[in-house]
Amino acid sequence: PRSVSSAASDVYKRQLFDQILALEWIQEYVAYFGGDASNVTLIGESAGAGGIGHLIASPLSKDLFHKAVHQSGGSSLTYPTSSSNVRKLANSFANSFNDPSIKNLKNISAEEVLEVSEEVYAEHYFNYVDDGFSVNRNLSDSYKSGNIQNVDLLIGSNNDEWSLYFDGNVNIRLWLDQETTPEKKIKLLELLTDIEDPVRKMDLLITAKNFVCPSLFMAEELKRNGGKTWVYQFNRVRDDELAQKYGAFHGAELPYVFDTHDQWLPTNKADKVLTEEIQSYWLSFAKTGDPNNDGAVVWPEYESSNDSTLVLDNEIYQRSHESSEICKIMDLF
């Protein structure tokens, strides 16, 4: 990309550079395809949403896009990866071979790479790296300082983001010991006293920390920076025994956004109606910068005073986010 051509060869967000290159291409050529370079909307889910979170904070993406749909992302804010840690892991990986030179590493088989990677990177989450170049500082600090793009944002997450990833061993107190302070642990346990199912309780906590709290934080900071923001919570659970087990899991909203329902879970009239409603919000936001459109339930802009959220379920309605109190206690940012 033009904006990174002078970068030294170091630990940078190469994936982010690819995204910036694509956005530069859109600015230069989209008009030839009937597009509008002054009305570019990004949409991403999970890791894709993480990329959007960094593009919003990157000085390299200035004026390359104007709106963003951020679905079920946020771990980059709660679990930043330092460039020094990445260098240590890279050196450990290279030194696992007799000859760690670049020339030799290029000739290593895929099987050898996978075998060593499983050991070296066993506990490593491949998140975006805080490199001090593509983003000037720690990501959350960039948002708090206002060093972000002035764009509009539609952001949210699902009710049961972590339900697919439990292995049957749920130890809430141990997790709280690792993730928060003793004082916050007591408050969180008191807040969740009425929830009897330990898996649901754990899911609620992890969903809040990794998805909800970062989303509310981003919505507030972009609004404070002059952008308009809307927050949603996807709660729809299919009418099926398997669906009831996992709830509104990570990625469950995607078939509704893109109308790509398949046979893995049953799809009925309620799902089709919700699909049309979600698509109308998303498309209206991309076209006009406002998700509200004729016939749809009104979606108010986000206000931190009440954590205003649009719930997408069998019925669509507005309320304060159910995890806002968890986020206030966690106080992550």
Language-model region placement:
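Alpha/beta-hydrolase-fold catalytic nucleophile elbow
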Residues: I43, S58, V69-S72, I155-S157, ...
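Substrate-access "cap/lid" subdomains that shape
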Residues: E28, K62, Q71-L176, M202-R224
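Single conserved hydrophobic/aromatic residue that forms the stacking wall/gate
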Residues: P1-Y12
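Alpha/beta-hydrolase fold nucleophile elbow
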Residues: G34-E45
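Short glycine-enriched nucleophile-adjacent loop
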Residues: A49-S61
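Active-site loop->helix "elbow" adjoining a glycine-rich segment at hydrolase catalytic centers
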Residues: R14, S46-A49
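Mobile gating loops/cap/lid regions near enzyme active sites that modulate substrate access
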Residues: C213-F333
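Alpha/beta-hydrolase active-site loop
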Residues: K13-A31, K88
